[in-house]
Amino acid sequence: MENQKNDNLNLLEAVVQNTGMGKNTLEQIVPMTDDVQFKAELLRQRNVYHQLNQEAHTAIEACGGTAQGQSAMAKLNTKMGISMKTLTDKSTRNLAEMLTQGSGMGVVDCVKAQKDYPNAAPGAKRLVQRLQEFQEDSRVKLEQFL
């Protein structure tokens, strides 16, 4: 039972960190584009990340835990990386490429988390699977802007 609780908390924390990264990245990138269709897609994705993040937070609290989220250093590293990659190129194509790569990394993180925490409850597993499917779908949608 304790093993399942730990796997639940760890898997849900992975969702919190993954969705936090997506949400924070999109909040930084949205103001960089004037492409109306691209911006609409980014806002849609940001809202889904926010929703999944809230669901994971709620589930962690229901398990008696407290979500940690991304560390300040991880947030800073991401922010600086985006700033460097967009310093000279804020084109829709470049932004879409960056986000496509990020979505791919998010999918890999979901797969790893599911393998690392096999004893998690079905609800936690469904949440990470929804996140993975969303990120796979997002990557395909972003490829339209390459």
Please place each PLM-identified region on the residue numbering.
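Amphipathic alpha-helical hairpins
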Residues: 1-146
